């Protein structure tokens, strides 16, 4: 019954969207995409086969603080005084810059998550691009190992603050590392955000310094739709009240996430779940992020997201774990070809953890189709027949 109701609502949204488009046409508005919007063609279509079998044995110690080493080369703190935080970062630089373009995927996780949520995806990207790329992820304020420089100061968690943090971290990454490791004419940045991280990416792009923004070839967001996200916030308090904040062991935490369907791949859960918890001296796993304390800022997180995303003056990719939750703004944008939409029907909310291989293939295709440094123009000029 719930599925039928969802389908009816979805059909109504399409009908409403079509009426809006007809009105726009009657008024003489151009329904074609902006010149700076996507012109991508079709990205890879994936079957609806089952998720890879879950592994029942871990290849690394549970809750091992060094588990990140399998996926990233460096774990470094970025101390940024103007943001009053030391940001815990993970990154991997290209093995070689012997290519026309070197993409750097800069990632932002969602609320209650951590930078290591992208670990499985990072591994897939780096492997498939044969080391000719950079990968960067980090823990946002209030998450993971990121900590305030001065803990006596108030710590806000509104969208504007998260966005300012993200841009400060990107600027630090560029000035401290990228400009010394990747020739500027080869650097291509893809911003990727999951859930709240997607909302942050849509605001961060326009707020970036122009020189750095010019290096961004596209913005990708994973499983986030404004209307659905705002509706979910209404149930957030109940969800938090019924979700354990601690477990007797880290193994118990991992098994809970798998059994509840919060993680669909055991291999991903082994690295992603421990990053959400602090391990006490007695082995107890205690959740790091207290989302309830963010409650007065929740209302800032998603309002206007769909419109911001659709109108970003760059290439855009939306990857969803199911298609029933598009809102009217996104439906109209999709009809007008404003962005690329890919749906992974078999994935859970954490697409980067549940379907890292498919997500990597999709991101690589998105980058290749939108990075003009990959275009090779062949000519016979000056050649004799």
From Swiss-Prot:
Belongs to the AB hydrolase superfamily. It is an enzyme of class 3 (hydrolase). Its EC number is 3.1.1.89. Demethylates proteins that have been reversibly carboxymethylated. Demethylates the phosphatase PP2A catalytic subunit. InterPro entries: AB_hydrolase_1, AB_hydrolase_fold, PPase_methylesterase_euk. This is Protein phosphatase methylesterase 1. Keywords: Hydrolase, Serine esterase. It catalyses: [phosphatase 2A protein]-C-terminal L-leucine methyl ester + H2O = [phosphatase 2A protein]-C-terminal L-leucine + methanol + H(+). GO terms for molecular function: protein C-terminal methylesterase activity. It comes from Eremothecium gossypii (strain ATCC 10895 / CBS 109.51 / FGSC 9923 / NRRL Y-1056).
